[in-house]
Amino acid sequence: MMRSITTILTATILLSLSACTSKPEYGSEPSMFLPGSARQTWAVAPAVNLSGVAQADPILQADLLFSQLQQTAGLNVIPVNRVVEVLAALRIEQVQSEEQAAIICNVLGCDALLVPTITAYDPYDPPKMGASLHLFRKTNVMNAGVDPRELVRRATPKPNESTPARSSFLQVVGMFDAANGSTRAAALLYAQGRNDPAGPYGAKGYLIEMDRYSGFVYHSLIEELLLKPALADAR
């Protein structure tokens, strides 16, 4: 009887040790770096929702983009709520011109304003999201003694007015449909190091929770934006 109990205890201990040694480990995600050696400060405006889906909340989407930007070495990011306060003070519903963006940058004291746009948003498996990032870099448009709200009014495009050429404007665009095998593989690769490998969903959680999938989308667009030669030249 004692021998039987000892055998059972030994087997239990061995199984426990085996479970401990085979526990999956977290992966490591690659880092993102702002080109150049000097730090910059960027601000994120509320997203422009063109998807027609109310679930794509402009403030939440901006916060998700803000979280991704914070992981970029060499970059300081102003919280979204501060940007919202400035937009309200300047009576701007959404940025409509490079001149308006420059005024906002001057008020916030930042180097650039990043405006996300949502063009498609389907949170159901397989998720799909279309988005673009518009980076407006600061220019010297402020006039001493002039109310910033008056400058904003002057910088607002008139109806049917053509948009002038933009010298300090960068844009990246993408459609991320998880029904596409390469997109799905990229999302799962992004999830490595960002999920609990012992959790119920593991990396697949990024294909189930839309906020996580949105993070993948913004991360991909930021990576593309940071590779723009014009961004490096501006340094």
Regions found by a protein language model. Give the residues of each.
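N-terminal segment of the mature soluble domain
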Residues: 52-117, 155-161, 168, 220-229
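Envelope-exposed proteins and targeting segments
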Residues: 38-41, 73, 109-114, 127-132
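C-terminal/domain-edge helix-coil "capping" segments
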Residues: 20-38, 124, 128, 137-235
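Solvent-exposed loop/turn segments connecting transmembrane beta-strands
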Residues: 53, 120-126
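Bacterial N-terminal signal peptides that target proteins for export
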Residues: 1-9
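Acidic/histidine-rich, surface-exposed loop or edge segments in extracytoplasmic proteins
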Residues: 38-52, 81-86, 197-201
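Solvent-exposed coil/turn segments that connect beta secondary-structure elements
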Residues: 47-49, 82-83, 118-121, 132-141
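Bacterial N-terminal signal peptides
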Residues: 8-18
